[in-house]
Design a protein with these regions (language model features):
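A conserved regulatory-domain signal marking ACT and ACT-like small-molecule sensing domains
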Residues: 345-552
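Glycine-rich beta-alpha junction loops
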Residues: 49-50, 199, 283-285, 334, ...
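Structural motif
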Residues: 6-8, 40-44, 85, 191-193, ...
């Protein structure tokens, strides 16, 4: 084995780690990487099994403030236990029991042993793990026990602080990796080490404005520390670790927020100076629009870091925008690949090559839903120094981040994505009170808004052609229009019920093959069009419909 391993980091999401078939694909991919040469090592970061994080969130709610008619925290806990049992059983981790039992009886007998080894007869009584259960599974069963005890503690105290919430939410990844390492060994990957991500990913507490930020939206700065990561790996060729979770400087568990597993994988890639970071999911990459609503959206084959970050921030859900920064920090290529089509098309994110000589290009039309818009009007604003500082001070004070901004002589309009506690929570109510009383402003609140964004490069160079997009908006109320300072997106805020239709019409304008042909005829020999540049077309792959119908 080489003394200087070359690392590849793979990240698999919840759907990719929830079935036996998907785990076989994961192990095949790992084996394929290992077969390249003796120096290649593989660092695997995985999420919780599908829906487990949602169940943990609901269990916290039901343990602290039960809602009548909803599953209890114990029922949700049992569902999580059985979900992991089903996977262990399907993979074949549980051997055949003696006694000539039918397959149904075998399953039921193992399920009973699994539950008894997790819960016992009394919530706080010591549990003896059934001796028939394989020893390799004992850490998983004990982790279930830890989760149950914490949920019972929440039930007794009737409260769950952000610190306790983070501890509970982290169990999804802790459980999936306990089971995952058993599956990998069972499927032939013997040289594998499970690593606790909390040993390596330590949050930057100085960035936290509140306990919610510190424990539930933790920030971990990218760094290179190959020696520490290799030490944690115990020099095994394969490492399995958790996405989403980390620790504070005093050793408490924290989580990186939803989508944090992408960021975890990127942080590990930077730490290891990996040669590549692969995000494995259930789609082929990033598309020119959300293919769930625009089936003829085309795959974007290549992006630079900033383009990918902007697409993710403005609505592309394939990856989290924060995951780009660590990869960019270490200049590591990122690939988005489909677990169901491992040798198929993909999106590659890499350093900018800027081969299009400064020409404008449109990359995608995307949207974000469930936004809140505030319009703040004050007639004493005009010409008043410090007015904007006064308006925005309460946002910082109550931990509410502003997304898009548009200003005039007498008003400021902003969009809000994440509001702690939602629009009915205390932070938002306090914000409105301060804006209306202390800033002497009239505040209008528009809920259920969507932001529709045209994402690209050097958009201002094609304002004349972009102006035709406004025809699509005729008859709709646009609450805000914003063009980014970096010239990367043009965004419109409107009521959510209209967003899907507008996105589809804008996408057709920019990416339809029929429209592109018409543009080529009408502009041939006179002008170029952002809808027919060769540099952009070379970046685009097949449509979603084509890829979905391709053989795997």
């Amino acid at each position: 084995m080489s003394s200087s391993p070359s690392w590849v980091v793979l990240k698999f999401g919840g759907t990719s780690v929830s079935t036996a078939a998907r785990w076989r694909c994961i192990c095949e991919q790992i084996a394929s990487h290992l077969a390249q040469d003796d120096a290649t090592h593989v660092w695997v970061t995985i999420s919780a099994m599908t829906q487990v994080t949602n169940k943990l969130t609901a269990a916290l709610q039901q343990a602290s403030r039960p809602v009548a008619g909803e599953p209890s925290h114990l029922e949700l806990f049992r569902s999580i236990v059985l979900q992991h049992f089903a996977l262990a059983y399907d993979v074949g981790l549980l051997p055949s029991l003696d006694g000539g039992l039918s397959s149904v009886d075998q399953h039921d007998r193992w399920q009973d042993k699994w539950l008894r080894s997790t819960l016992g007869d009394d919530g706080f009584a010591p549990v003896v793990i059934d001796a028939v259960l394989p020893t390799a599974l004992h850490p998983l069963l004990l982790e279930f026990r830890n989760l149950y005890r914490i949920l019972e503690g929440v039930k007794l105290t009737e409260e769950a602080s952000p610190r306790i919430q983070a501890r509970v939410l982290a169990f999804g990844e802790l459980l999936s990796t306990h089971l995952g390492v058993c599956i990998m060994q069972h499927l032939g990957l013997s040289d594998v080490q499970r690593v606790d991500a909390r040993q390596l990913l330590v949050s930057e507490s100085s960035a936290a404005k509140s306990d919610e930020d510190r424990f539930l939206q933790a920030e971990v700065l990218p760094r290179e520390d190959v020696a520490r990561a290799v030490e944690a790996s115990q020099r095994r060729r394969v490492v399995l670790t958790q996405g989403f979770i980390g620790s504070t400087k005093d050793g408490a568990t924290c989580v990186l927020g939803r989508g944090g597993s992408d960021t975890s994988g990127s942080l590990f890639a930077a730490m290891l100076r990996a040669k590549r970071y692969e995000i494995w999911t259930d789609v082929h990459g990033m598309f020119t629009s959300d293919p769930r609503y625009v089936p003829d959206a085309r795959l974007i084959k290549s992006l630079d870091y900033r383009e990918a970050q902007e697409l993710a921030a403005m609505g592309a859900k394939v990856l989290h925008p924060r995951c780009i920064e660590p990869a960019q920090f270490a200049q590591i290529p990122v690939e988005i690949r489909n677990t169901n089509d491992p040798n198929g098309e993909k999106t590659v994110i890499q350093p900018s090559r800027d081969q299009d000589s400064g020409s404008p290009k449109i990359l995608a039309v995307v949207r974000r839903a469930n936004m809140t818009t505030l319009s703040i009007t004050a007639f004493d604003m005009c010409g008043t120094s410090g007015f904007l500082a006064k308006v925005f001070a309460p946002f910082e004070r109550f931990g509410i981040s502003v997304d898009l901004i548009a200003t005039s002589q007498f008003s400021v309009t902003v969009t809000l994505d994440h509001i702690p506690g939602g629009v009915g929570g205390a932070p938002f109510k306090n914000l409105l009170r301060e804006l209306e009383h202390d800033a002497h402003s009239k505040v209008q609140v528009f809920e259920s808004c969507s932001v529709v964004s045209i994402v690209g490069r050097r958009l201002r160079k094609s304002l004349a052609e972009l102006g035709r997009v406004f025809d699509v908006l005729e008859g709709y109320d646009v609450l805000l229009l914003s063009e980014s300072a970096e010239d990367l997106n043009l965004s419109f805020v409107l009521q959510q019920k209209n967003a899907d239709e507008i996105v589809a019409r804008m996408h057709k304008y920019f990416f339809s093959a029929e429209d592109a042909t018409a543009v080529q005829r009408s502009t041939a020999g006179t002008t170029s069009s952002i809808r027919r540049t060769s540099s952009r077309d070379s970046l685009l792959g097949p449509t979603w419909q084509t890829l979905r119908g391709s053989p795997h």
